[in-house]
Amino acid sequence: KPKGVMVEHHSVINTLMQLEKKYPLEKNDSILLKTNYTFDVSVTELFGWFFGEGKLIIAKSGLEKEPEALFNMIQEKKITHINFVPSMLQVILNEITQTDIEKLQSLKYVFSAGEALSGKTIKQFYSYTLPAVLENLYGPTESTIYATQYTTNEEMKGLLNTPIGKPIRNVQAFIVKDIDQLQPIGVAGELCISGVGLARGYLNRPDLTAEKFVDNPFVPGEKMYRTGDLARWLP
């Protein structure tokens, strides 16, 4: 059941501007809109091109279910930026042939979000010698789509767990124990998020809002979102 996350406009703008700074849409670039509007990542496709010089290409509904049609569209429209959940990315990678690789040469960034990205998927992605970089993005809707970013590379294809990276600009991440104790580097704890990207709370659900959006003990006057996810800082 949808929780009714109340996201502020300025939080959306912050996310979109940081994406543009990190993964710019240049004059001849294009991003593919193929994500259903009920999934928060669709916001980055619908409006992400506002801050760059590229363009938006709208895919027909269900295009992901037709890998060959997707490959043809990437080639025809010279798509440079594209989003996948890891499970769908794995399905797409399984369908790529040597001929298809030629159709994917326009890609610059392949974004993976919404699920854990496996080392198997990373290994397969880089086995195709595509020009694109695979980006691992993490963030609940409560932090306005993305909170952290990690650029994968060919050398990490044997890793068991893929890092989620560091917070994007204007977002802070805390690894805590019992809410008010910061965990040392390398020690697991609950991942909490604060900063400009934080949502206002849940619509008409004050109890859940109070439970998940707590006072930030490390930044007085600010709120902190409890993700419930375990994480640790790498050395």
Task: Tell me what each language-model feature is.
Residues K1-E8, V12-T15, L25, I31, ...:
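A generic "structured core" feature
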Residues K3-L32, D40-T80, Y150, E154:
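Conserved AMP-binding/adenylation subdomain of ANL enzymes
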Residues M6, D40, I58, E64, ...:
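Short aromatic/basic micro-patch
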Residues H9, T35-Y37, S42, L56, ...:
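Generic structural signal for small/hydrophobic residues in well-ordered secondary structure
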Residues S11, Y37, S42-V43, A69-L70, ...:
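Acidic donor-diphosphate engagement hotspot in glycosyltransferases and nucleotidyltransferases
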Residues V12, G119, S127-N136, T151-P235:
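AMP-dependent adenylate-forming
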Residues P24, F39, L63, S118, ...:
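Nucleotide-sugar-dependent glycosyltransferase donor-binding/catalytic pocket residues
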Residues F51-K55, I79-N83, L93-P163, Q172:
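Gly/Ser/Thr-rich phosphate-binding loop
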